[in-house]
Regions:
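Secretory-pathway ectodomains
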Residues: 1-117
Length: 117
């Protein structure tokens, strides 16, 4: 059995070489990813890269062949590599006037990556 690191496990996806875990984002430590891969020997292989440093993954994982997709609390759909947890593509799907007026948000689009298929 896999034990959560910080909150409670919301989702487990079985992989060939381990497990993909999504913990509850509620009260999860800020700046840490709540999605991570655990090996068959129960060691953490990697944490999924966050689209923003202060974001969390709040939606179910959509598992694909070599990556997975998950939406964040701030409205970013991220395609994340199953190899190392890095973001290979991300798309901002939600944006509010309040967010766009914040001083730390003007360069938000520079932190988003896209990848050619």
């Amino acid at each position: 059995m896999i034990k959560p690191l910080h909150t409670k496990i919301e989702e487990i996806q079985n992989l060939k070489d381990g497990y993909l875990i999504r913990e509850s984002y509620f009260e999860y430590p800020k700046g840490k990813s709540n999605i991570y891969k655990v090996s068959l020997s129960k060691k953490i292989d990697w944490y999924a890269e966050l689209p923003f440093e202060d974001d969390v993954y709040s939606n179910p994982i959509i598992l694909k062949e070599n990556h997975f997709i998950c939406a964040s609390w701030k409205g970013v759909d991220s395609h994340i590599s199953l190899k190392d947890g890095s973001i290979i593509e991300s798309k901002l799907t939600r944006w509010t006037k309040k967010q766009s007026e914040q001083e730390d948000q003007p360069n938000v689009f520079h932190s988003l990556r896209s990848f050619q298929t």
